[in-house]
Amino acid sequence: AARGMDGLAAKTLDYNKQLLALGINVNLAPVCDVSTDAGDFIYARSFGGDAAATSEFVTAAVSAIRDAGVAAVLKHFPGYGNNADTHTGVAIDKRPYETFEESDFLPFEAGIAAGAPFVLVSHNVVECMDAALPASLSPAVHEVLRETLGFDGIVITDDLAMDAVKQYANSEAAVLAVLAGNDMLITSDYQNDIPA
């Protein structure tokens, strides 16, 4: 079996052809996060700690997903870094904006350049962009995605049932998400969130 970039592209193409055969035409992948610590929550899901190598993997993955006839979703903008798991609580990202410019944005820029039609925004509170709201609910973070990175595709939230946004009522989170600039909302809590 092929390894490295060729292996990644071949496996990604195969997996996404299987998704399409099942009627699934959007894949919540690839993970574009740069994680430098093997003990971090996102590390096992990321392509690693080097922004340049992660960007190469993201480009290959987006191309293979597209070649399979499936739409790729770049996640978790603006970059997860070494933050805590937002499935189980609030994650505060205290890194300076320059870190995002020099590292975290690069895989997203590569994925956008490769033609990914979707970007998923995380629930991390990224203090250098908006110290009050999770990224998914923050107009400032969405402005960075649209204006600084030039993304003109579809923006979606991470799952609004995650603990990182539980301090908001279901309907409040949905409204804030739309007002922030999300085009689509994800929720796994259908009974409570769909009426919003």
Regions found by a protein language model. Give the residues of each.
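Active-site-adjacent helix-turn-beta-strand microarchitecture at beta-sheet edges
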Residues: 5
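Glycine-rich, aromatic-flanked loop segments that form ligand/cofactor-binding clefts
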Residues: 1, 11-34, 54-79
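Second-shell residues forming the walls of enzyme active-site clefts
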Residues: 49, 53-196
